[in-house]
Amino acid sequence: MNNTEIIENASKVLEAIDAAKEEELRNLNSLVQPRAPLNAGSTPGEIINEIKHLSTRDQEGGTSSKDEEESGAGRTVAEGAATRDHKYSKSRPKKQPRSGLQSGAAGKNPTPDGEGGDTCNRELDQHSDGDGHSNTEGASSDLASIQPCQTDDAPCSSTSYLDEEDEPAVRPKTQCKQSGLIESKEDEDGMLSELHEQHKGRSKRLSALGRVNSSPIPSPRPDELLKKGIGESIVWSGRMTESLLSHGVIQCVPGSDRYQSGKSVSVADAHLNARSACWTQNKEPQCHITNSPSDTSTDNASRSELRTIEEEDYLQDDDFEQSIEDRDFDPGDWDPSDKHNDNGLLLQILKNQEEILNRLKTIGSIQESLDSIKRIQSKQGLALSTLEGLLSSVMIAIPGSGNPGSSVEINPDLKPMLGRNKNRALKEVSDELTPPNQFLQKQGMTIQQAVKPKETMFPPAIKTGESSAKGFHPKENLVSRTVINSIITARVNNPELAAKLKLAVAKAQTKEELERIHKSIIKNLKN
């Protein structure tokens, strides 16, 4: 069900509710303007006409047999009849009713014709409610005491003789006279049946909602099932086109009873005749046809005949290619009866496609490997460029023998470093004591040339009187005083002694005093 159908159903329900509200308002307005009440001298015919008018007004206003109107009409009739009976009971003396008439009114004194003594006894007006149970309500319950009777001997009256104190229980007294509106017994019976039909229907206030609620929820037919997924991931779902609304509330989606998980599918759930094609390499194709699922007598036999296709029954790659070459795919020569012969080819195609998909999944990992290689290559290029920049500013100084007569150009931008080769960058780090003798070199004589390193190539010697890594020698400055105070704070644990030493450092004026304080502190810490 799509959203459009849901919105349409919801709008229909809202319209039905609005129509029911309007009908209820019209009924209330009609009840505000009642007719003139019945007086004490109303006849049974007038009472019946009043009830008929009320039921007709209910039908015109869109409602029938409402409990409120029926109870109101019953109370009006009962009050008028009770008032009249109370008036007659006061004006006339109390009499005991005849036993024959009393039994005849109750239907217990049979006549020669085989019927009750009360030939004009009317059945109570009954109407069925919404559940089909017969109930006597409203005016019918109050008119149960109004039973006009007419015997063969003389007219009689069915009265209820009670004390005057029991006024609420007094029933109306009617004369057994033929009313001008009732000409015959057939007309009376017809009118009573008409009243019975008028009061039999149930209320139409929410009839539109009843129609919506009564709409059955359709079950998915086999031809409307949709297959989603391949292999074992199969889900069957039906298309629901009918309304699933109930009183404006969207119901939950009903669960599907036709779902079969995995490959455990029974033959009874097959929509058509199930066929299974079996292919082998050197055999003709065989097909086992099962019976229809509706035939219950052969259901077990069809299940035993149905077999699954094993992997070794599939066509191999060579056989598949050979079968493709041998077959003629002319559409005019294709026979629908050979449909089961193509099942093996289709299975092989699906198998090949699955293998291709599995291989295509490795493309992602290959792409990730290529990206990592590119990142490593960029890092290596950056490292090589850095080393190249460092090597361009370095001169390797290799002490040793070489060509002493070679002229060397001194590059002040290069930094000398030690190496394994000899005679390279030697003139930058050494001084020649004696110039080379060209005459002796021409005669082939080996001359040892004296070489002295430059003094600037060695670091200066450590001075004993100055502070260095070898030792601390205080001076007359703020830095030396701060160093001594730091030593006192870190090494002296006695607070009183530390305070005295800091006070002595502050009072020292000469270099000798600071040295004496420093030596005493170091000596005490060593001990």
Curated annotation (Swiss-Prot):
Belongs to the morbillivirus P protein family. Residues 479-527 are annotated as: Interaction with the nucleocapsid (N-RNA). It comes from Tupaia paramyxovirus (TPMV). The gene is P/V. Residues 312-400 are annotated as: Multimerization. This is Phosphoprotein. Essential cofactor of the RNA polymerase L that plays a central role in the transcription and replication by forming the polymerase complex with RNA polymerase L and recruiting L to the genomic N-RNA template for RNA synthesis. Also plays a central role in the encapsidation of nascent RNA chains by forming the encapsidation complex with the nucleocapsid protein N (N-P complex). Acts as a chaperone for newly synthesized free N protein, so-called N0, allowing encapsidation of nascent RNA chains during replication. Homotetramer. Interacts (via multimerization domain) with polymerase L; this interaction forms the polymerase L-P complex. Interacts (via N-terminus) with N0 (via Ncore); this interaction allows P to chaperon N0 to avoid N polymerization before encapsidation. Interacts (via C-terminus) with N-RNA template; this interaction positions the polymerase on the template for both transcription and replication. Keywords: Host cytoplasm, Phosphoprotein, Viral RNA replication. Residues 49-60, 120-134 have a biased composition (Basic and acidic residues).
